[in-house]
């Protein structure tokens, strides 16, 4: 199958399926806050300026999807915090890429609002996608999409 054959829509595509679950604005902002250590409902509501009913429904959905665990931290009154699961933590790269894109193409005159400091070396990090086989940076120009084992071409409508 030629590369150009993959340029049309195809059934079950991973990006589309993922965006169906986490592509909504508030969901991505809740994830960002969680990556930066915010776990409690009230702090999420204050930091984001999100309506409380909207926050409740998004958190409920994120728990149902397995991206957060709802964990009690107080019994009187009963209160819960929201902790990222492994599946939730694995979305970190997506948030960082969006942050980097915003810094590059929607810059603020005073510079980036958030910088990431790497714990191991103590320097500001500039995260990149790296090939685990050769160590080269991965870009849209040096990879080729190929059908994977789950590929199913979308049938054209008659």
Swiss-Prot record:
Coiled-coil annotation reads none
* PROSITE patterns tied to this protein: HTH_HXLR (PS51118)
Cite the HTH hxlR-type domain residue spans from the record. 13-110
User: What keywords does the record list, in alphabetical order?
Assistant: DNA-binding, Transcription, Transcription regulation
Entry's Gene Ontology molecular function annotations: DNA binding
PANTHER family assigned to the protein according to its UniProt record, in alphabetical order: TRANSCRIPTIONAL REGULATOR, MARR FAMILY, TRANSCRIPTIONAL REGULATORY PROTEIN
* Annotated protein name in UniProt: Uncharacterized HTH-type transcriptional regulator MT3179
């Amino acid at each position: 199958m030629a590369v150009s054959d993959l340029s049309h829509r195809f059934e079950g595509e991973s990006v589309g399926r993922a965006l169906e679950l986490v592509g909504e604005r508030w969901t991505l902002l809740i994830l960002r806050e969680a990556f930066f250590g915010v776990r409690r409902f009230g702090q999420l509501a204050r930091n984001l300026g999100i309506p409380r009913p909207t926050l409740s429904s998004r958190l409920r959905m994120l728990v149902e999807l397995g991206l957060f665990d709802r964990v009690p931290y107080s019994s009187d009154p009963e209160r819960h915090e929201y902790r990222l699961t492994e599946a939730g933590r694995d979305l970190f790269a997506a948030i960082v890429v969006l942050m980097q894109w915003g810094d590059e193409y929607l810059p603020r005159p005073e510079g980036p609002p958030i910088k990431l400091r790497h714990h191991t070396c103590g320097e500001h990090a500039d995260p990149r996608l790296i090939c685990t086989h050769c160590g080269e940076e991965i870009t849209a120009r040096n990879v080729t999409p190929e059908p994977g084992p789950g590929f199913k071409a979308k049938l054209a409508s008659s």
